Amino acid sequence: MTNYAIILAAGKGTRMTSDLPKVLHKVSGLTMLEHVFRSVKAISPEKAVTVIGHKSEKVRAVLADQSAFVHQTEQLGTGHAVMMAETQLEGLEGHTLVIAGDTPLITGESLKSLIDFHVNHKNVATILTATAQDPFGYGRIVRNKDGEVIKIVEQKDANEYEQQLKEINTGTYVFDNKRLFEALKCITTNNAQGEYYLTDVVAIFRANKEKVGAYILRDFNESLGVNDRVALATAETVMRQRITQKHMVNGVTFQNPETVYIESDVEIAPDVLIEGNVTLKGRTHIGSGTVLTNGTYIVDSEIGQGSIITNSMIESSVLAAGVTVGPYAHLRPGTTLGREVHIGNFVEVKGSHIGEKTKAGHLTYIGNAQVGSSVNVGAGTITVNYDGQNKYETVIGDHAFIWEQLDSHCTFGSWR
């Protein structure tokens, strides 16, 4: 079975009121387009084609060589957008997934189930649908008395009966690839919006007595299409819940999960304790047995097992096992800490390596320094590393005791 994918990402997203293309707004650290593309990978597409338009170079840069791209110059509807992909997929045998790039909550599991349903039922087209308590604004699924899908009608074109229907079109489909592009040649703009509706191919298939099916999502949240900042916030809330629940299932304890922000690519080992108001972003890894107390903020960093981070900020740093940091410490980019290092309150470290079992208990700045092991850095110590033009390295040997301002270019030997 050969699968293909078309991702619709050409729209501007006027209701977002933003210079940024809609699909590039982020949910839990990844753009919506990245979330969709990761889910699409679950069906192992032989080829993925992304339809781009508004600020196309920015959109293209997100996926780079992971996808082929086609350009939709004019925004003439979803049917027109899919037509643009014909140059990439024309004549190919297989099944083509069509999905919008603004649906970040759709899961790979659901897309795989959709494909399996489509193949097992030998459909020419399968619509991913959901049951909505308030279906206003969505296209409705219209079935006959035998339960067969006969058409999809958009909100603006729906009659009174159709507007009462609760089963809605999520905007995700699977088609027989060849039949999709053949049917697209038959659709028109004869509708309330004057656009080429992709949904019109359903009526064409039905007129030819070809089989059209619908696979109903179990979780309505997955159907969310983000068109404004309100929906973006809703997507963020749902994604945050998913992420914290995933980590809890894998052995992480959250004292107050509703207040924690963890991005999609963060890795957390079992037996980590996370208190409230903790933020973990980017490519961060937290080792087993670590405790992150209230207010801790970590970005793109590796925290070794058994460490304790107390109400501190850590950026692009690497900490070995058994390190203690805080409260109110700041580890800036380029910091590495050896095993069992202690960085105390109101200590700032930048671009420095600190050897194992060294202690800097309070009120200290260590910048561009190489500090040995088992060093005691006393209160008020500052490595003066900047002369107004250049920065210089300070070297402090093992077992040294330091408690003063250190001018740049200094080297202090080991004690013992």
From Swiss-Prot:
Predominant place of localization: cytoplasm
CDD domains registered for this protein in UniProt: GT2_GlmU_N_bac (cd02540)
Gene3D superfamilies (UniProt xref): Hexapeptide repeat proteins, Spore Coat Polysaccharide Biosynthesis Protein SpsA, Chain A
Reaction equations catalysed: alpha-D-glucosamine 1-phosphate + acetyl-CoA = N-acetyl-alpha-D-glucosamine 1-phosphate + CoA + H(+); N-acetyl-alpha-D-glucosamine 1-phosphate + UTP + H(+) = UDP-N-acetyl-alpha-D-glucosamine + diphosphate
Annotated GO biological process: cell morphogenesis; cell wall organization; lipid A biosynthetic process; peptidoglycan biosynthetic process; regulation of cell shape; UDP-N-acetylglucosamine biosynthetic process
Gene Ontology CC terms, in alphabetical order: cytoplasm; membrane
Region (N-acetyltransferase): 251-416
Positions annotated as active site in the UniProt record: H362
Binding site for Mg(2+): D102, N227
Annotated stretches, region: Pyrophosphorylase: 1-229
Binding residues for UDP-N-acetyl-alpha-D-glucosamine: 8-11, 22, 72, 77-78, 139, 154, 169, 227, 332, 350, 365, 376
Enzyme class: transferase
Keyword Magnesium: yes
Binding-site residues for acetyl-CoA, renumbered to this chain: A379, N385, Y386
Keywords attached to this entry: Acyltransferase, Cell shape, Cell wall biogenesis/degradation, Cytoplasm, Magnesium, Metal-binding, Multifunctional enzyme, Nucleotidyltransferase, Peptidoglycan synthesis, Repeat, Transferase
UniProt-recorded Gene Ontology molecular function terms: glucosamine-1-phosphate N-acetyltransferase activity; magnesium ion binding; UDP-N-acetylglucosamine diphosphorylase activity
Details of cofactor binding: Binds 1 Mg(2+) ion per subunit.
Region feature Linker, mapped onto this chain: 230-250
Cofactor(s) this protein requires: Mg(2+)
Compartments reported by the entry: Cytoplasm
Known pathway: Nucleotide-sugar biosynthesis; UDP-N-acetyl-alpha-D-glucosamine biosynthesis; N-acetyl-alpha-D-glucosamine 1-phosphate from alpha-D-glucosamine 6-phosphate (route II): step 2/2; Nucleotide-sugar biosynthesis; UDP-N-acetyl-alpha-D-glucosamine biosynthesis; UDP-N-acetyl-alpha-D-glucosamine from N-acetyl-alpha-D-glucosamine 1-phosphate: step 1/1; Bacterial outer membrane biogenesis; LPS lipid A biosynthesis
Subunit structure of this chain's protein: Homotrimer.
Function: Catalyzes the last two sequential reactions in the de novo biosynthetic pathway for UDP-N-acetylglucosamine (UDP-GlcNAc). The C-terminal domain catalyzes the transfer of acetyl group from acetyl coenzyme A to glucosamine-1-phosphate (GlcN-1-P) to produce N-acetylglucosamine-1-phosphate (GlcNAc-1-P), which is converted into UDP-GlcNAc by the transfer of uridine 5-monophosphate (from uridine 5-triphosphate), a reaction catalyzed by the N-terminal domain.
NCBIfam families, per the entry: glmU, PRK14354.1
Record protein name field: Bifunctional protein GlmU
Gene (UniProt): glmU
